[in-house]
């Protein structure tokens, strides 16, 4: 009798162990619209046989790793002149260390993995500057006075610290304007690059990338011009039509090759509403061979433009490189940013970057341009000690950047649009699966995740965002 009992217990233990193995675990991280629960780790889910616990009346999200799409570079924002200054100069060492870890550390933070860095001043800068400023009316075609010393004060130290915390960060650089003396009216504000300055500007960009890399910041991508269809009025910017951009790339591409730079060139870097711009550049055989793909912004048009360009040029990549949050946005701000991430990724983006990673209580410092933008981190300098607040953008991006690693691959997942559950899924190189789900409805939604013939049951509260991870 005792022997039979022992055999029964042993068999029961084996069955329990087998059951546990069959019930694959899913980690769950959730953020509510009011941020009362932010990247909160919920109870784990378990996959089990579909017939065992599947209700026919719930939505099913199918995840299929056999259907594979683009490789992922990362998720992040920009350490602008203003952002870097706030982080480096306006926080105590203890506070700065905490913020940097919460931004970039894969264990303690959200592991920001993509940085788009202005080359020279943008609108989110404390002053207007380039790396080759000259007195009005003077030129320096040999770039004798070239220097990135301005950036060594606080921008480069912050980028280097970010790279130490997360070496997987992809860095992109973008000029808002050439030095004023290279332009049609000798100013960084508005105007165009002169054709007779192509050689000098090419050398300037080569020197900029080389200087950054010598300073310890590898540059993976460079876009030729920020928002080339917008002629700025009160901050650095440059009008550059597609006809001029493709002509300039014919200079820049060979110069990068001659200098031994493996930095990839991106075209356009502006809104969805003019896909014909990158299509013109990519249709030029001389320019296109030097261009890795197209950078997009979100401030006009529709995300479907990314798919349009991909359909015409499937061999070229796509990047969402700027989409700021700001006071103009209303309602569920968490959902606004989550929709950007999900929809950009479902339309072939290899990255999603917002704008200034840190701003103050006045949405600056700035010298023109956006004075209503929102950062991942808002630093209130009107109180002592300065108060740090993490915004909806921080948490929305964190739902991707913390779990989707560099070189992950987007895989297929069911999606139900802005009236239901929006989803996007990835497989990391270690084999782990990441599913991001946004509940666009104002009510809790029961659903099931189906993976390799098994089902995990889940519920997501109205307006909330969740990330599900399993292996």
What are these regions (language model features)?
Residues 8-17:
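Bacterial N-terminal signal peptides
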């Amino acid at each position: 009798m005792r022997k039979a009992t022992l055999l029964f217990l042993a068999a029961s233990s084996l069955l329990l162990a087998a059951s546990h193995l069959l019930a694959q675990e899913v980690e769950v991280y959730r953020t509510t619209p009011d941020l009362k629960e932010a990247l909160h780790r919920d109870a784990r889910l378990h996959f089990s046989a579909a017939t065992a616990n599947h209700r026919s009346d719930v939505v099913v999200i199918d995840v299929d790793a056999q259907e594979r799409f683009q490789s992922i570079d990362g998720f992040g924002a920009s350490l602008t002149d203003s952002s870097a200054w706030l982080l480096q100069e306006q926080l105590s060492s203890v506070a700065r260390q905490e913020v940097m870890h919460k931004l970039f550390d894969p264990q303690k933070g959200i592991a920001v993995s993509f940085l788009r860095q202005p080359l020279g001043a943008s609108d989110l800068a404390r002053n207007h500057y380039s790396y080759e400023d000259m007195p009005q009316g003077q030129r320096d075609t040999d770039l004798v006075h070239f220097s990135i010393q301005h950036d060594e004060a606080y921008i480069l130290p912050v980028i280097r610290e970010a790279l130490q915390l997360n070496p997987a960060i992809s860095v992109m650089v973008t000029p808002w304007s050439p030095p004023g003396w290279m332009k049609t009216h000798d100013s960084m504000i508005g105007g165009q690059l002169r054709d007779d300055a192509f050689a000098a500007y090419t050398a300037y960009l080569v020197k900029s990338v080389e200087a950054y890399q010598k300073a310890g910041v590898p540059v993976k991508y460079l876009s030729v011009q920020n928002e080339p269809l917008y002629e700025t009025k009160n901050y650095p910017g440059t009008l550059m039509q597609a006809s001029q951009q493709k002509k300039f790339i014919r200079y820049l591409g060979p110069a990068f090759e001659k200098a031994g730079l493996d930095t990839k060139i991106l075209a356009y870097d502006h809104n969805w509403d003019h896909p014909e711009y990158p299509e013109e550049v990519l249709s030029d055989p001389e320019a296109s061979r030097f261009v890795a793909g197209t950078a997009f912004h979100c401030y006009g048009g529709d995300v479907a433009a990314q798919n349009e360009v991909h359909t015409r040029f499937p061999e070229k990549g796509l990047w969402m490189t700027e989409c700021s949050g700001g006071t103009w946005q209303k309602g569920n701000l968490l959902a606004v940013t989550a929709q950007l991430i999900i929809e950009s990724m479902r339309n072939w983006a290899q990255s999603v970057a917002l704008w200034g990673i840190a701003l103050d209580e006045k949405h600056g410092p700035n010298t023109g341009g956006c004075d209503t933008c929102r950062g991942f981190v808002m630093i209130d300098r009107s109180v002592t000690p300065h108060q740090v607040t993490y915004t909806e953008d921080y948490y929305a991006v964190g739902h991707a950047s913390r779990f989707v690693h560099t070189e992950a691959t987007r895989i297929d997942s069911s999606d139900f649009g802005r009236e239901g559950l929006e989803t996007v899924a990835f497989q990391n190189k270690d084999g782990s699966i990441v599913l991001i789900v946004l509940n666009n409805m104002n009510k809790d939604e029961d659903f099931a995740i189906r993976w390799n013939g098994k089902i995990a049951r889940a519920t997501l509260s109205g307006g909330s965002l969740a990330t599900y991870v399993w292996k």
